[in-house]
A protein has these predicted regions:
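N-terminal core-entry segment
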Residues: 1-260, 300
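Aromatic-acidic/polar surface patches that form glycan- and anion
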Residues: 99-102, 152, 266, 313, ...
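Acyl-CoA/ACP chain-elongation machinery
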Residues: 263
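Intrinsically disordered, low-complexity Ser/Thr/Pro/Gly-rich interaction regions
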Residues: 267-335
Length: 335
């Protein structure tokens, strides 16, 4: 078992909310509120409403689904629904230095378990900021496969760590929950996004589900191999996982303060082009019928998001031509 994973788990177990610097506490609250707003907005998407209605037939209790009417569900299902809703409109925040939307992967499980277990607001915030820390550090060492989307991969393990923290597990218990969660990792593809396949959003919701399930597996006595995380991230869902920098600045550098917030409801590689377009429109004030074409120079990842006629709402979030046209015609690229 890697020493770094064990020490990271011990940090999650031992760190209190009061140990988190005040500026980091403030930023954590901002990220929580931003993410909660995105979940509420996404809860109104038709497929999310339909899933919520279907799962209500076997509804449990103990955790709130953040949607109109505030329905309740068991914590695993509530976390799944809230995480799926939060992914549905492509407005969630993310890690600035590596790929991943840490808050939306971690917070749904934290909210569901925190409510179900009767934890205080401070305990919920602590689990959230610590889960975010684990997410950023695991993602920083993880090399995903070329087509992989990071929903339900390294960040799912961080959600499990946050859930285990809320259950009161010690460092070894949190490590076990994370290693058990390695068998729950998913293989979503970026091609889902450009094709408009909303299956991708379920992968986001499954991280919340894992946050509630993995600690229960650990408490039930399930065991995991010692190198489960290294093997899963380095050989199965990914092509490499470097642990040498996993603990750098731990407790001094808080990754949640290095996030980004989305101002446009589309995939973040599109955002720089929209920033430039917004400045041009503000300076020139053209009418839409005065614009014959828009030429964009961008980097490779954004350049593949080029379908001018996306097949549905979700695919439009991954179309640079659609986002640019929406900004010209509507004045913004919101959801």
């Amino acid at each position: 078992m890697g020493r770094q994973i064990e020490e990271l788990a011990a940090f999650v177990a031992a760190t209190r909310w009061d140990d988190v610097p005040a500026p980091v506490q403030h930023h954590t609250r901002l990220v929580l509120l931003d993410t909660l707003g995105v979940i509420l907005a996404g809860s109104e998407r038709p497929e999310v409403r339909a899933l919520r209605d279907r799962l209500a037939a076997t509804a449990g209790s103990g955790a709130t689904v953040y949607a109109p009417g505030w329905p309740v569900q068991d914590p695993r299902t509530a976390a799944l629904l809230n995480g799926t809703a939060g992914r549905a409109i492509e407005l969630c925040e993310g890690l600035r230095l590596v790929s991943g939307q840490a808050a939306m992967q971690v917070l749904p499980g934290v909210l569901a378990l925190g409510e179900h277990l009767g934890r205080s607001g401070r305990e919920i915030l602590a689990a959230f900021v610590l889960g975010y820390e684990v997410a950023a550090r695991l993602a920083g060492g993880f090399t995903p496969r070329p087509l992989a989307h990071q929903n339900g991969q390294a960040l799912l393990l961080a959600a499990a760590a946050a859930g285990a923290r809320l259950y009161g597990l010690d460092g070894k218990g949190i490590s076990r929950a994370m290693r058990l969660a390695a068998v729950l990792l998913l293989t979503p593809s970026y091609t889902n996004a450009v094709a408009g396949a909303t299956a991708l959003n379920i992968a986001g919701g499954m991280s919340g589900h894992a946050a509630a399930l993995a600690p229960e597996l650990a408490l039930a006595g399930f065991t995991a191999q010692e190198d489960a995380i290294e093997e899963a991230l380095g050989q199965l869902v990914g092509s490499a996982f470097a642990t040498d920098g996993l603990l750098d600045g731990l407790g001094a550098r808080w990754e949640i303060t290095r996030n980004y917030f989305r101002l446009y409801a589309c995939c973040n590689p599109i955002h720089p082009a929209l920033d430039c377009l917004s400045e041009i429109l503000a300076e020139l004030h053209p009418r839409p019928d005065e614009i014959a074409r828009i030429e964009v120079a961008t980097y490779r990842f954004a350049s593949v998001m080029k379908n001018p006629d996306p097949p549905n709402y979700f695919a439009s979030k991954y179309s640079l031509p659609h986002a640019a046209a929406a900004m010209v015609v509507r004045g913004h690229a919101g959801f």
